[in-house]
Amino acid sequence: MIWGSDSHNPSNNPAIAPPPGTHNASIYLVAGIAALGGLLVGYNTGVIAGAVLFIQKDFHLNPTQEEIAVSAGLMGAIIGALCVGPMNEALGRKRMLKILAVIFIAGSLATAVAPTYGFFLSCRIIVGFGFGATGSVVPVYLSEVAPANLRGRIVTFNQIAINFGIALSYWVNLAFAATGKGWRPMFAVAVIPSAVLFLGMFITPESPAWLASHGRWDAARRALERLGRKPVEIEQELNSIRWAGELKEKRAWRELLRPGLRLALVVAVGLAFFQQFIDPSP
């Protein structure tokens, strides 16, 4: 028997695979709330593009300082992306998104009232930590709450939200630039979706997979019920989660370097790197 073969995954067994179309509005509501994290990633990434012209005038920045102002958020994002993994596993997806929403609220407000250039940079690094971490947490959460037959569709909510957030930041920049109100309201606007994300996470369930991985099987069952799963689907998903946990224990990270997987790993990492390097975002 070869571990990892699709034939051993309960969700891939035709006899017990979830029937197509078995879902309701619950999963879309949860996905829509969580995708606000993606919107905040896009908005906080894009807003600096229009705001920096006004910031340069207010703080009398030279070209080097202007470049640092633009890149400060990305510096924080690198830190957030590197640090979020262990925190996400320890605290859970739902709690992490609440914490990140608070970071966005506080960071956006502080950025909007920044009295000095140095204070502004500090705030942008904090917000950058938030969107760097959120970019990792949201897709994991979406993939773990979605049923197998909808997983691809639900996970794309995050990328759609990121791009919409970038576009929204440009529209907001244009609106405030036209009214002559300057750069501060541009950053303050991010408080609104941040607050909605924070409040929305109180009505969403924790990831069933995360709960099960911490031995909280009854809580995982209740989470699946809240997500609208039928009793038979709940048993199927719990079996699939249990199977995945057993497989994880049998695998080691070094197996990614096996000849059969090495090329795929290099291609996947390379695509992710060059996607960001060439910046294809609008």
Where does each model-flagged region fall?
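Transmembrane-helix signature of 12-pass secondary carriers
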Residues: 1-282
